[in-house]
């Protein structure tokens, strides 16, 4: 059964001072943990970098976690990712800076989005991170999204 989400209501209430595609506020410590998980997964697992790669990974069912930068300009570049992640039931988290996201992904330029495909040695940290993100989502009235392959 396909999930249908109305984009008008989906993007209705971003946190104050955040772009319209941000659905919940991520504390700085959780965002840093997400960048750390991405960095470890880059070294010991598998990641994808960039919005196009992230979109393909989610659509193909490969993504374990999607990281989306909050400072993307224009915001329409990544605006589809939260909606796509919700539809495909893939956990996602926002990080404050595309520069930090690019650095954590191991590239010398900024990245609007990145995806953990295989967490490698960050598997336990990834589970804890997704659990924490789901707690944040619950506080904002959003449903939990478990790790793919988990209930």
Swiss-Prot record:
Top-rank taxon, per record: Archaea
GO CC, any one term: ribonucleoprotein complex
Gene3D superfamilies referenced in this protein's UniProt entry, alphabetically: 3.30.1330.30
Cross-referenced InterPro entries: eL8/uL1-like, Ribosomal_eL30-like_sf, Ribosomal_eL8-like_CS, Ribosomal_eL8/eL30/eS12/Gad45, Ribosomal_eL8/Nhp2, Ribosomal_eL8_arc
Protein name in the entry: Large ribosomal subunit protein eL8
Assembly notes: Part of the 50S ribosomal subunit. Probably part of the RNase P complex.
Record bears the keyword Cytoplasm: yes
Compartments reported by the entry: Cytoplasm
Main location: cytoplasm
GO biological process, one term: ribosome biogenesis
Pfam family for this entry, one: Ribosomal_L7Ae
Family designation: Belongs to the eukaryotic ribosomal protein eL8 family.
Keyword 4Fe-4S (UniProt): no
The protein's role, per its UniProt record: Multifunctional RNA-binding protein that recognizes the K-turn motif in ribosomal RNA, the RNA component of RNase P, box H/ACA, box C/D and box C'/D' sRNAs.
Origin species: Pyrobaculum neutrophilum (strain DSM 2338 / JCM 9278 / NBRC 100436 / V24Sta)
Keywords assigned by UniProt, alphabetized: Cytoplasm, Ribonucleoprotein, Ribosomal protein, RNA-binding, rRNA-binding, tRNA processing
GO molecular-function terms, A-Z: ribonuclease P activity; rRNA binding; structural constituent of ribosome
PROSITE patterns from the UniProt entry: RIBOSOMAL_L7AE
